[in-house]
Design a protein with these regions (language model features):
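PDZ domains - specifically the beta-sandwich core and the conserved carboxylate-binding loop
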Residues: 7, 11-21, 228-237
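Eukaryotic intrinsically disordered and solvent-exposed regulatory patches
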Residues: 1-4, 12-13, 26-27, 43-47, ...
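FERM/ERM/4.1 membrane-cytoskeleton interface domain
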Residues: 61-63, 71-242, 328-331, 351-356
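Short loop-to-beta-strand transition segments
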Residues: 46-66, 130-135, 273-278
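Short amphipathic, charge-patterned alpha-helical segments
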Residues: 32-50, 310
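Detector for glycine-centered tight turns/loop "hinges" at secondary-structure junctions
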Residues: 22-24, 66-67, 246
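Short, contiguous acidic and Ser/Thr-rich linear segments
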Residues: 19-38
Length: 359
């Protein structure tokens, strides 16, 4: 008997990915070294994401140590300590575009699927009427024109599955019964007769992009220099810092609003997160803002996650503001060279930097 066609499975890496439409994609790699980029490229091909839009997306997985969601580093090797089980990932929007309607139609649908999931999970709290407006356009996009023969009572949940979720206490600030809400959405669906799939998707995104926390990712567990618990809100505009409203994770009073054009440099040191921020238009005064995460075993992981998320978002601002990027890089190098951070303390450090000269 010849064994030349038999191969060892010890080097076979299996990955299972949940796509944005909740379908599953499985793929295997039969080589010793697999980069995150290798998996991401296959997923983008499956999801039909064109190369010029792939920067908006990423792959998430659950950190086995602290149970939090982490972005897969595409430039590093995928390592697995499990020899027989597949690695599990979620394809997700990493950075929301400022105007998703300008993207290609297939990518718009992916963005909308992500937003619908976030709304249903309670990441946004919407008035009932706005909730219904989004759903009305979404139903038109997914199911086409209303048809009384096919769209019987209960059709929204039956045909849309997890993407249909009536307002609840976690995703809406209003009260309405499921039956009343279904009638509300059905009437809106009827009113959209003749609207194409592309038009309905764009209309739904047009509402979503005006939401207060559109494109924002929240990071909890931070503490400022006064010992106050804070929440970090990272978006394509910058980093907002809120006081924690209550023990149930919720943003309260706005403490700071740092725009990307003013954030010179960011880094973390164990559980501490630092930002060099330019104060005033002349940029001669730079302040170091320091925060720390809870003194738990995994505080350093929370700090790293915030840094990765912030850098992903700031990159988009710099791509659209090249001259500003040059200025910030010059100031960043100058700030780092001064090494004025007070090690082990959270708070403010005032630095005085000369104005950067761009050549």
């Amino acid at each position: 008997m010849s064994f030349k066609f038999l191969r060892s499975t010890s080097n076979v890496l299996e990955c299972q990915v949940v796509l944005l439409d909740n379908s599953h994609f499985s793929t295997t790699f039969d080589k010793k070294t697999v980069q995150g980029r290798d998996l991401f490229d296959r997923v983008c091909e499956k999801a039909q994401v064109p190369p010029n839009h792939q920067q908006y997306f990423g792959l998430q997985y659950i950190d086995r140590e602290d149970g939090e969601v982490v972005w897969l580093n595409l430039d590093k090797e995928i390592r697995s300590s499990r020899k027989t089980k597949a690695l599990l990932y979620q394809f997700a929007v990493k950075v929301f575009p400022q105007d998703p309607i300008k993207l290609e139609k297939d990518v718009q649908i992916l963005i909308l699927c992500q937003l619908k999931t976030l709304i249903n999970l309670g990441k946004f709290s919407l008035p009932v009427n706005k909730h219904a407006l989004i759903d009305g356009f979404y139903v038109q996009a997914m199911l086409g024109d209303f048809n009384a023969k096919r769209h019987k009572p209960g059709y929204l949940e039956d045909l849309l599955g997890l993407f249909y979720c009536p307002p609840t206490g976690i995703n809406s600030d209003g009260n309405i019964s499921e039956e009343e809400y279904e009638v509300m959405v059905k009437d809106l669906h009827k009113s959209h007769r003749g609207m194409t799939r592309e038009e309905a998707v764009s209309a739904s995104l047009g509402i979503c992009k005006e939401l207060e926390n559109y494109g924002a990712s929240m990071h909890y567990g931070g503490i400022d220099s006064h010992g106050v618990e804070v929440v970090f809100c990272v978006s394509i505009h910058g980093i907002r810092v809120y006081q924690l409203k209550n023990k149930f994770p919720e943003a309260g009073t706005l403490c700071h609003n740092f725009h990307w054009r003013d954030i010179i440099s960011m880094f973390c040191d164990n559980a501490k997160f630092y930002m060099y921020v330019a104060e005033g238009r002349d940029e001669q005064n730079v302040t170091c803002r320091a925060f720390r995460f809870h003194k738990s075993l995994y505080g350093y992981k929370a700090s790293q996650r915030l840094l990765v998320d912030a850098e992903n978002h700031q990159k988009f601002f710099f791509e659209d503001n090249l001259e500003r990027a040059k200025t910030m890089r010059s100031l960043s190098l100058e700030a780092k060279s001064m090494k004025k951070i007070r090690s082990g303390m959270a708070g403010r450090v005032n630095l005085s930097l000369r104005r950067a000269t761009i050549t």
